[in-house]
Amino acid sequence: MCAFVPHVPRHSRGDNPPSASTASPAVLTLTGERTIPDLDIENYWFRRHQVVYQRLAPRCTARDVLEAGCGEGYGADLIACVARQVIAVDYDETAVAHVRSRYPRVEVMQANLAELPLPDASVDVVVNFQVIEHLWDQARFVRECARVLRGSGLLMVSTPNRITFSPGRDTPINPFHTRELNADELTSLLIDAGFVDVAMCGLFHGPRLRDMDARHGGSIIDAQIMRAVAGAPWPPELAADVAAVTTADFEMVAAGHDRDIDDSLDLIAIAVRP
C-alpha cells in the first residue's frame, strides 16, 4: 500500500536506507502499488510501513520466516538481521529480480501467493504486511499461510483500516486494492482459516504527526493525496514535513487500550496456528 504516485522528480534521501547495501543495479520505480525507500516524496508511506517491521522483527528472532508479498524487499532484509532464514515471495518478476540483486541475505522466489511454493509446516513465521488488501482470494491465501506454518507458528498481517483509509466508500480508494478490511473482518478471516489467539493492534499518528496534520488542513495524508491526484506541485512546507517523518512518529496501540481500533490508520494482527 502506498499513496497515489505524485508528479515529482525522484530524490535520494540523506539518511541511511534500511539495508546492508547502498545501491541496487535493479531499481524499482514508484508506481503507486508498493512503497519504496530512499524517496523524500514517499517517505511518509515508507516510514508507516517500516515501523511495523521494526516493532515486530523481534518475534522473528532465530526463526525460519516467510515474507509473503515482499515488494521492494527492505522489510525482508530487516527481518534477516534477526531471523535464522528469510524466504521472500512476490508475484512481480521485476520486484523479485530487484530483491535478489539488492538483498543477498534474502532467499527470494516468484510465485502466486494463493499457491505458496513451500512444503507443509516449513516455517515458523509468515509475515504479510500491506499486501492482503491487494489479493483477490484472501481466504485462500490465509489458508495457505496456515499450511506452511509449523505448529504454534505466527501469522503477522498488517493492512489499511478500511474505516479510515476509504471512509464512506463501497470500494477501495486505492485502485490497486481489491478488498480492504476493518478489525472485525480481519479477525474473522484469520479465525475462519483455523488460526487462534488473534491479537489486534492499531497504528496511529503520534504527537509530531498530529502537529503536522494540524499544519496541513487537518490531514497530512489528504494533503499528499490531493496534490498527487491533481498533479499539483507540493508546497515547500508539505515536502519538508513529509521528508522529516520517522518511524518514531507512529504509535502502535493494542486493541482495547486507550484508542479505538476503528480510528486506527492500519491494522496489525498476530495470529497463532494451533
UniProtKB/Swiss-Prot annotation:
GO MF annotation: an example: methyltransferase activity
Cellular component terms (Gene Ontology): cytosol; plasma membrane
Alphabetical list of SUPFAM superfamilies matching this protein: S-adenosyl-L-methionine-dependent methyltransferases (SSF53335)
Any Pfam family: Methyltransf_11
The entry's keywords: Methyltransferase, S-adenosyl-L-methionine, Transferase
InterPro entries: Methyltransf_11, Methyltransf_Superfamily, SAM-dependent_MTases_sf
Listed Gene3D superfamilies: Vaccinia Virus protein VP39 (3.40.50.150)
Domain of life according to the entry: Bacteria
Job description of the protein: Probable S-adenosylmethionine-dependent methyltransferase required for the 6-O-methylation of the polysaccharide backbone of 6-O-methylglucosyl lipopolysaccharides (MGLP).
PANTHER family from the UniProt entry: METHYLTRANSFERASE
Protein name listed in UniProt: Probable S-adenosylmethionine-dependent methyltransferase Rv3030
Source organism of this protein record: Mycobacterium tuberculosis (strain ATCC 25618 / H37Rv)
